[in-house]
């Protein structure tokens, strides 16, 4: 079976979860099954719940992981909603979310993620109603500016939005290739990433509501308050990593009083656990040589030791 995607930080993921014995493991973003396959092999007593919103990825992984069919349950869902759909939540001992776009999605011309694509789609869930086409051709100049500024951190966001609106007034923009030509190839000042790459990333974030989905997922976990459970999140964008870092910091605090209050009044017992990774884990030199797309990957991990379910 030809594998269309290389899982990032595979060794590091296995290291984070190496001490898991029994219970349930939730792979929130199964993709093409690389992480789950390795963990299934190394943890024979763990049962798995494997989730993905991409039907193509799910179908592929069902075939790839057929030897483990008696230990794995598949769920088609966005990972922000999966906690509401699954059983055995109280038995979760490990949770993994790899929230990047797979190589298969990037390289599949019809999905419209690549700047070379003849399509303009970018939906991770192809049942979603809004694609990149609708955003590029119907959003106002102000809305587009906000997307490029907030999600792409582009200094010339207004200029890019203006160019798009000018071109679409002549004819609808129908392909990623066409959009790429409109945006231009230039670098974003001192940054090594091209403005087109940043703009495409910003559009993809808007199409899939990626930051909202991540926040919703973390808020659901906060409400769930798992016991004896390790959570690892792999992100590929500085905004995503910032959100994860902020939530982990919040969860690790005992005191939740306003910083202006001199004396603790909250009981000083609100911590949900400990941060496992003091700094985000990045790809090794060896991995970067094999898979250049791992260069932006950052993994953070948290241990929920919420024994009293406060």
UniProtKB/Swiss-Prot annotation:
The lineage of its organism: Bacteria, Pseudomonadati, Campylobacterota, Epsilonproteobacteria, Campylobacterales. Keywords: Cytoplasm, Methyltransferase, rRNA processing, S-adenosyl-L-methionine, Transferase. Its EC number is 2.1.1.199. The keyword S-adenosyl-L-methionine applies. It comes from the Bacteria. The keyword rRNA processing applies. It is an enzyme of class 2 (transferase). The gene is rsmH. It holds the Pfam family Methyltransf_5. Specifically methylates the N4 position of cytidine in position 1402 (C1402) of 16S rRNA. GO terms for molecular function: rRNA (cytosine-N4-)-methyltransferase activity. GO terms for cellular component: cytoplasm. This is Ribosomal RNA small subunit methyltransferase H.
């Amino acid at each position: 079976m030809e594998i269309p995607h290389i899982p990032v930080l595979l060794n590091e993921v296995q290291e984070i979860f190496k001490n898991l014995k029994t219970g349930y493991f939730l792979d929130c973003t199964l993709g093409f099954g690389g992480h789950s396959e390795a963990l299934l092999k190394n943890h024979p007593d763990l049962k798995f719940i494997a989730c993905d919103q991409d039907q193509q990825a799910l179908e592929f992984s069902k075939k790839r992981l057929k030897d483990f069919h008696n230990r794995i349950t598949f769920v088609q869902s966005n990972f922000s909603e999966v906690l509401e759909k699954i059983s055995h939540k109280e038995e979760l001992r490990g949770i993994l979310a790899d929230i990047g776009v797979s190589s298969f999605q990037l390289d599949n011309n019809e999905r419209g993620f690549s700047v070379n694509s003849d399509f303009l789609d970018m939906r991770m869930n192809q049942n979603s109603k809004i694609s990149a086409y609708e955003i590029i051709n119907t959003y106002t100049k102000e809305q587009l500016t906000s997307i490029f500024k907030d999600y792409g951190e582009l200094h010339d966001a207004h200029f890019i939005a203006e160019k798009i609106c000018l071109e679409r007034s002549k004819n609808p923009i129908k392909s990623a290739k066409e959009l790429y030509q409109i945006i231009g190839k230039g670098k974003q000042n001192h940054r090594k990433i091209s403005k087109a790459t940043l703009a495409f990333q910003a559009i993809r974030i808007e199409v899939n509501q990626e930051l909202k989905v991540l926040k919703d997922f973390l808020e659901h976990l906060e409400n769930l308050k798992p016991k004896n459970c390790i959570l690892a999140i792999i992100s590929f964008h500085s905004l995503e990593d910032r959100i994860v870092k902020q939530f982990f910091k919040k969860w690790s605090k005992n005191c939740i009083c306003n910083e202006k209050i001199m004396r603790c009044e909250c009981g000083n017992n609100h911590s949900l656990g400990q941060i496992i990774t003091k700094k985000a884990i990045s790809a090794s030199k060896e991995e970067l040589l094999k898979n250049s797309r791992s260069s932006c990957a950052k993994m953070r991990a948290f241990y929920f030791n919420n024994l009293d379910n406060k």
